[in-house]
């Protein structure tokens, strides 16, 4: 009885071995009965519900599992099961058994079961054999398995400490890990040193493994300034492509003559604004150049300039696409510009390849965007690979205007695209520096610029929109937050409590989000 009770765990391994043939017929029948009626009837196997499972069991008895897995065409003997459905049942059953065998293997080696389905989709029934032969296949950033776990598995399977596959996997892990932390490449000396420390291998062994990766073009090493930079192949190709496309776009120029000045004057009149000299130059530059950078801190009038560029492109008969890295930024861009904006990912048609774990985009060189001009806001959040994908989707001659604040944090992904383009001095750029009078009224904006200049922000003026309150006791802090949200801020700022957002650096504890939500609600 105890064995039967545990059959949901053990049946997969039994089916994969010759042990099942040695079981007494009654026990085997009980195992199959429990598996079919309780397990398969739950819907895990496509095409089988409780009634169908019992019919299969009644007809085939102890041979039911073998029939389903190896001779599913015999299931057509049961009324209601067509040849097509029989094949679907067999295929679904084989997949479920394969996933269970794989899950058992992962469980036995203390690896996350969440990796079972992605691995099965990628390698099918050969997954366990392939992992046993090449355990570092698991060192994949999409599988959420740490390198230390994979390495422990490999060592337990007999992989030697200086085995080339182990050293190469460690090198790739270091490059992937640093890419996740924002780095496009690593100096060769740092990469070798980090890998030696990670797996305890000698320098000569690591250098040889790195040379092997370079020969296979999995890693690309190129001289950069005074160091040899080591790139993941995709990072190197993205960087080279972005540089080449933008360099080519810098050569695109249009002679608009004095007509553009009149158009800008008309736009000012229609929008009820008067551009500062820097803003006017930005709008004019967008008319003349194939690629333009527009930068500035908060309150410097970037949005006003962008609205002018959009209106100018409309007057020129250009089909303009507005983009931003996030949904919130795209929504704000739409509201301020009076024209629909999209996220970059949505516009390019992002999809997820379950087999490779890679992000792909429908829009590319073969199927480019139907656009004459692209304006991208919040460029500081755009990483290198996303920038490369965007440029691949743009036809030659399509104008590009990049807008952002270089003093914001760089992108989460690898690369500091906006900052690097500004420092290159190659892209035509306009930097808005003057803070407009209306924006100067905001202490938030004044303090942002103060921090950029290395000055201490003003913190004590509780009549402003930026102030600091100190509370020593956690309970008192929660009480203050509730007072601010329910009384002081709504009365002072005229903001409904429902439109106030409270942020906390922790989830647990008196001042964590869980307790704050309870108190606020």
Task: Cite the ranges covered by each PLM segment.
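Short basic/glycine-enriched coil/helix segment immediately N-terminal to the Walker B
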Residues: 356-372, 383, 391-398, 497
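Short hydrophobic/aromatic beta-strand immediately N-terminal to the Walker A/P-loop
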Residues: 292-295, 401, 501
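Conserved helicase motor core of P-loop NTPases
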Residues: 406-521
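Interhelical loop and adjacent transmembrane-helix boundary motif
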Residues: 1-26, 30
């Amino acid at each position: 009885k105890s064995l039967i009770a545990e059959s949901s765990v053990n049946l997969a391994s039994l089916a994969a071995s010759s042990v099942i043939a040695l079981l007494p017929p009654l026990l085997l029948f009980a195992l199959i009965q429990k598996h079919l009626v309780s397990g398969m009837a739950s819907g895990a196997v496509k095409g089988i519900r409780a009634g169908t499972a019992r019919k299969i069991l009644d007809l085939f008895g102890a041979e039911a599992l073998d029939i389903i897995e190896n001779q599913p065409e015999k299931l057509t003997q049961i009324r209601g099961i067509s040849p097509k459905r029989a094949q679907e049942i067999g295929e679904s059953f084989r997949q479920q058994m394969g996933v269970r065998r794989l899950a058992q293997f992962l469980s036995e080696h203390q690896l996350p079961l969440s990796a079972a389905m992605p691995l099965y989709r990628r390698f099918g029934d050969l997954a366990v054999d392939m992992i046993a032969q090449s355990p570092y296949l698991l060192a994949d950033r999409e599988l959420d398995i740490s390198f230390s776990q994979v390495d422990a598995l490999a060592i337990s399977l007999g992989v030697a400490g200086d085995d080339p596959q182990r050293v190469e996997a460690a090198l790739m892990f270091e490059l992937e890990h640093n890419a996740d932390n924002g780095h496009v490449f690593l100096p060769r000396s740092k990469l070798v040193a980090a890998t030696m420390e990670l797996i305890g291998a000698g320098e000569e062994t690591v250098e040889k493994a790195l040379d092997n990766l370079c020969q296979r073009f999995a890693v690309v090493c190129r001289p950069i300034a005074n160091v040899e930079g080591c790139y993941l192949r995709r990072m190197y190709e993205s960087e080279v492509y972005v540089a080449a496309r933008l360099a080519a776009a810098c050569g695109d120029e249009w002679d608009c003559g004095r007509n553009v000045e009149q158009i800008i004057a008309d736009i000012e009149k229609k929008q009820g604004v008067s551009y500062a000299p820097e803003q006017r130059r930005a709008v004019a530059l967008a008319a003349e150049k194939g690629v333009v950078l527009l930068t500035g801190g908060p309150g410097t009038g970037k949005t006003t300039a962008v609205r002018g560029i959009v209106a100018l492109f409309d007057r020129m008969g250009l089909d303009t696409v507005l983009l931003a890295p996030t949904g919130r930024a795209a929504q704000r861009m739409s509201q301020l510009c009076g024209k629909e904006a999209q996220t970059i990912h949505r516009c390019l048609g992002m999809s997820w390849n379950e087999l490779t774990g890679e992000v792909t985009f429908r829009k590319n060189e073969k199927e480019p965007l139907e656009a004459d001009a692209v304006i991208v806001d919040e460029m500081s959040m755009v990483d290198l690979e996303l920038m490369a994908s965007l440029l691949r989707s743009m036809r030659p001659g399509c104008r590009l205007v990049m807008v952002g604040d270089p003093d914001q944090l760089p992108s989460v992904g690898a690369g500091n695209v906006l900052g690097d383009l500004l420092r290159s001095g190659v892209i035509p750029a306009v930097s808005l520096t003057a803070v407009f009078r209306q924006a100067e009224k905001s202490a938030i904006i004044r303090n942002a610029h103060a921090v950029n200049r290395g000055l201490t922000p003003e913190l004590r003026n509780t009549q402003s929109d930026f102030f600091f309150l100190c509370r020593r006791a956690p309970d008192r802090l929660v009480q203050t937050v509730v007072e601010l949200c329910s009384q002081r801020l709504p009365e002072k700022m005229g903001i409904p409590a429902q439109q106030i957002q409270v942020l906390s650096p922790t989830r647990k504890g008196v001042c964590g989000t869980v307790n704050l939500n309870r108190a606020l609600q």
